[in-house]
Amino acid sequence: MTLQSVLLGAMIILGPILSMTSSNWIIIWIGLEISLLGFVSYYMLMKKIMSGEGIMMYFLIQSVSSTVMLLNGLYIFVNHASSYIYLFIFITMLMLKIGMFPLHFWIIPVYSKLSYLNIGIVGLLLKIVPMWILMHMGCITSEMLNLITMLSVTSMLFGALIGMNLSKMRMVLGASTITHNGWLGMSCISGSLFKYFITYGFSLVILLVFLYLGDKMSISLSLLSLSGLPPFMLFIGKINVLLMMMETNLWFIVLVFAILSAVISLVYYLKFSVMFFMNMKNNYLKHYKMAMFLLVNVTFGMLLFLT
């Protein structure tokens, strides 16, 4: 590991920290761009041929959305303009950055070109600031909240339907991201972002690590964990979001879409989970791994729910 790679990795991490510790829109935007530039520069330095095309596509989309966000953010946060047009465009660009329906078109093409480490950075670290901005936008009207809610639940269902027709692991992770973006969107407006992001982030990181290591037993269990199947901890995260959303006027629609997306998603998660499980050699270690994985998931999930 070279000094350059360490510095660029630090940029990826320090960008979100800078944004979330400032109340100035320009500083928030600069932090957002620091992490993006650090990510792109790092993988150009590493010369990842396979992921080069995906990263450039990601960079173009993020650059366009960031430019539009900067201009609209100046009107909203600096000039305190209350125009619905500026607010609508700003939220639209946030959804493009995150990859939420109907602006999810780039997720699967980009994910299919990225390594598992890249997917973790794009799906978690570079998503922190846009989600944080969405959660702390005090100028959002009730109409905009209802719109975000509807798009979130649609993203949940649409991502689940896309995943049914995919057969490659990276593409399935992309479809899963679209679904979880819907859950993250709902957690932002319900004030439960921290708990859901922690459970989702932990489940995704564990899966990506085991995919990199090629541990089939652990991959199988990690897929079930990412699906939100009880008693895994992501189930606790989803229940917490639904309980918070029960206070809104659209609670029935949220509940119906959430159940539908969860059931549909579970089908393709189970398909891949069973595939990895059946290809694994039968030995006593798998029972030990299963017990330990379940224990950690259930314990962590319950502790988070009780906090």
Curated annotation (Swiss-Prot):
Is the keyword Nucleus assigned to this protein? no
The Gene Ontology terms for molecular function here are: NADH dehydrogenase (ubiquinone) activity
List its EC numbers. Answer: 7.1.1.2
Q: How does the UniProt record describe the way this protein sits in the membrane?
A: Multi-pass membrane protein
Annotated GO biological processes are: mitochondrial electron transport, NADH to ubiquinone
Q: Could you tell me which InterPro entries the record lists for this protein? A: Complex_I_Subunit_2, ND/Mrp_TM
What this protein is reported to do is described as:
Core subunit of the mitochondrial membrane respiratory chain NADH dehydrogenase (Complex I) that is believed to belong to the minimal assembly required for catalysis. Complex I functions in the transfer of electrons from NADH to the respiratory chain. The immediate electron acceptor for the enzyme is believed to be ubiquinone.
Family to which this protein belongs = Belongs to the complex I subunit 2 family.
Q: Under which name does UniProt file this protein?
A: NADH-ubiquinone oxidoreductase chain 2
Q: Which organism is it from?
A: Albinaria caerulea (Land snail)
